[in-house]
Amino acid sequence: STRVRSSAASDVYKRQVDVACSSGKDMEKFWEIFDERLELCHEALMYRHNRLKGTPSDVAPILWQNGALARLKKGETIDKLLYNGYSTISLGYAGLCECTRYMTGKSHTDPEAKPFALEVMKHMNEACAKWREESHIDFSLYGTPLESTTYKFSRCLQERFGIIPGVTDKNYITNSYHIHVTEEIDAFDKLSFEAQFQELSPGGAISYVEVPNMQNNIDAVLAVMKHIYDNIMYAELNTKSDYCQCCGYEGEIQIISDEHGKLIWECPNCGNQDQAKMNVARRTCGYIGTQFWNQGRTQEIKERVMHL
C-alpha cells in the first residue's frame, strides 16, 4: 500500500513476515524473495514519485507557495522539491520480530538471532542507498506503525500460511523492529536493545515502554526519561488513562471476550460495556487516541506486558 504525507513524497510497506514464510526457512530462498519484493517496492515508490511529477504548486498554495513547505511561484511545478533531500520517499517495514522468529526459531532479542535481524535492516538500508545514488531521490527506511492494517496483514498471513505458533497465531503483527508486546523485558533493556535498530531506521522510528500509573513514582519516570535521552533517538512511555461515564471509575478499562469470542471493553467497577459511555486512552502508532480499534489492534493492546 502507498500513502502521501506532508514532508514525505510516498511510503510503501514491506511485509517481512510474508517473505519469511514464503521461503520455507530456506535462507538462500529468503534473500532471493527479499530482493524480489524490494524491487517491487522500488517500482511502487517510483510510480508514486512519477505520479507527483508535474503537480502545480497551485493545488495547495499554503503548502507550496506561502512557505509551509516551499515558496514556489504560481503555476510552477513541485518537481524540484522531489529530489536531493528536500522530500523523502519511504520504504516501510513491519514484522521484523515474527520474520526473525520464523527464520531462526528465536526472538530477535536472542543473541543467536539478533545478527539475522540486524542484517535484514542493513540490507534494506543498502537498497535505499543504492536507489538514492541512482536517482537523487531521498529513499529512506521507515519503521511502519501499521495502525489498523496490522489486522488485515495478519489475516492475510493466516490465509496464506495457516497458523504458525509465534509467527501467524495472533491477529496482529509487530510494528517495525519492536520487541513482541508479550515478551517479558524491563524498560531499560528494551530501550537499549531497540536503540540498535532505530539507528538503522533513519526514515522514521519510535520505541515504547509500557508503564502503570506513575503519579506516585516520579523518580522512576525520570530514570526512564534519562535513559531515553542517553541511549535512544525517540521513545515514549505508555500508560493507561480511562474513565467510565456510568460510574465515574478512573483506571484501566478491561478488554474481555464476549460469548462470541469478540474482544470488547468493560468497566471493571460497574460492568459497563457501552463504548459510547466510556473514555479509553491508549497509544497506537505514536498517538494517544480515545477512539476504539479493530480486533487485531485490540488484541495487541490487551496483550501488552508492563516494562516497569
Could you describe each region identified by the protein language model?
Residues L146-Y151, L157-I255:
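Catalytic alpha/beta core of large soluble enzyme barrels
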Residues A20-E32, Y102-K114:
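Inter-helical turn/loop segments and adjacent helix faces that build the functional surface
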Residues D258-N272:
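Cysteine-rich micro-motifs
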Residues N269-L308:
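Long insertion/accessory domains within large nucleic-acid-processing enzymes
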Residues D35, T109-C128, T298-L308:
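Short secondary-structure subsegments characteristic of cysteine-rich extracellular domains
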Residues G54-G75, M121, I137-K152, D242-G251, ...:
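A glycine-rich phosphate-binding loop feature that marks nucleotide/adenosyl-phosphate handling sites
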Residues T2-A9, Y13:
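Single conserved hydrophobic/aromatic residue that forms the stacking wall/gate
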Residues A44-Q65, P111-A113, C128-Y142, A235-K240:
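Flexible, glycine/charged-enriched surface loops at secondary-structure junctions
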